[in-house]
Amino acid sequence: MNQIWSTGPPNFYFNSEWKENKRNDRTIEDSLRELDGLIHSLERTHIEVQTNPKLKNDVTALNDINKKENKEEITHENYTHQINSIPLTSSNLNRHFSFSRDYNQSDNSNNNYYREYLSKPRYLQQSTKEQTFNEINKRKSAAIIPPWLNIPENSRFFVIKSSSLKHVKRSFYNGIWSSTHFGNKRLSEAYKKLNSGAKVFLFFSINTSGRFCGVAEMVSDLKMDLDTSIWEDEQKYGKAFKVRWVIVRDINNRSLKRFLIPSNEMKPITHSRDTQEIPYSIGISIINLFKTQDSDIFSFLDETYE
């Protein structure tokens, strides 16, 4: 079967099978799958085109070609285009469009599938679109966004407020951190009282930056033998503890203001002080936001970071 390829923006494409499946005996499952794939494709295309001047020029050029060709058939050998020069093959298309040849005409089956589709906790899942978007943006940013992160039950979450971007970078490269005397005491107590297998996660934010910049796991209690001379005023910090950075990327405060902290007079997490503890459920939600938010991917590891 000949495939017809679009000369529109990258990843916006269809084939003749799509047209053939537009029949009266289609199930709701077919329609929802097609719509889901099309929406993901359009969202990703819009973001890529708007944020990449080169792609804008490519899209304009391709549209001009389409006009000149008029009604002539355009084959994939001539005008196939996708980011990273990956061929638009059937296997790639299946990530966005999935069709069933066994059409189920049972209304009950359709209704059951529709209810199941709506009940899925989609906001907790990382879709193919999000995974692919993050893979592409890793080339634009040095951000660290793991596809999966082990967060055991009864883990605890704390906000870390740093006065300096330099201190945060040195923490990343040296794998240690130290708070104030009071903050260190609070974190040490939390670490010692952890249930078996649980962890302590730290949400880092630099004062007056208007954003959070990453997540680190506390992997030791306070130690005297760690080198705190990496910071400008080592006498101020004294003891330190080991950390392992698990996420490095920015999340703007406006995306986090909806998370209210009961132990801090129901103020947003963005108004938290250093070592403010965050409820488990909110901590999980923020981790998911770090992992899945698919716009404005920047990190303090980028050369142009400000």
UniProtKB/Swiss-Prot annotation:
User: What is a biological process (GO) this protein takes part in?
Assistant: regulation of phosphate metabolic process
The record's GO CC annotations read: cytoplasm
GO MF: mRNA 3'-UTR binding; mRNA binding; N6-methyladenosine-containing RNA reader activity
Effect ascribed to mutating residue 273 to A: Abolishes binding to N6-methyladenosine (m6A)-containing RNAs
Q: Does the keyword Phosphoprotein apply?
A: no
What results from gene inactivation?
Answer: Defects in meiotic progression.
Q: Where is the YTH domain?
A: 155-290
* Binding, RNA: 161-163, 207, 231
Keywords of this entry: RNA-binding
A Pfam family per the record: YTH
Keyword Kinase attributed: no
Q: Which InterPro entries match?
A: YTH_domain (IPR007275), YTH_prot (IPR045168)
Q: What does this protein do?
A: RNA-binding protein that acts as a post-transcriptional regulator of phosphate metabolism by binding to the 3'-UTR region of PHO4 mRNA, decreasing its stability. Acts by recognizing and binding N6-methyladenosine (m6A)-containing RNAs, a modification present at internal sites of mRNAs and some non-coding RNAs.
PANTHER family xrefs: YTH DOMAIN-CONTAINING FAMILY PROTEIN (PTHR12357:SF89), YTH YT521-B HOMOLOGY DOMAIN-CONTAINING (PTHR12357)
Its recorded name reads: Methylated RNA-binding protein 1
Top-down, what is the taxonomic lineage of the species of origin? Eukaryota, Fungi, Dikarya, Ascomycota, Saccharomycotina
